[in-house]
Amino acid sequence: MITKNDLNTIFKWAKNTDFPLKKAPTAEGYSNKDIYISWLKGAGKKVFIRKKIMTEEVADIFLKDEIIFATFSTFESGTILNPHRDPDVYPCRYKRIQLPLKIPNRNHCFMIWDGKKVLW
């Protein structure tokens, strides 16, 4: 099970890591600006983890079966993502956890869930 302590460890590590970024492939109309990502974990027939940029403690957390896929993403100021649903790429249901690392203006960085504005 992923614990709050695990999430705090990932958060602290990620805040101090310089991620190698690549432009994310996105569908037409998904976003008004480019999004950049750094792949961290993928799981399918085999599990792949980008250990080169992880501490041993963080790699151990990412090795847990509960984490199926992980990326670091960065959004430019003013990025708008239209409401969307991620495709079902795994055979079982999964939850998505988003850990905002840097929020320049709390009132301008938010998500709308079920018609309600959610601030971090």
Q: What does each model-found stretch correspond to?
A:
Residues T55-W120:
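Catalytic core of non-heme Fe(II) oxygenases with the double-stranded beta-helix
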Residues M1-K64:
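Non-heme Fe(II)/2-oxoglutarate
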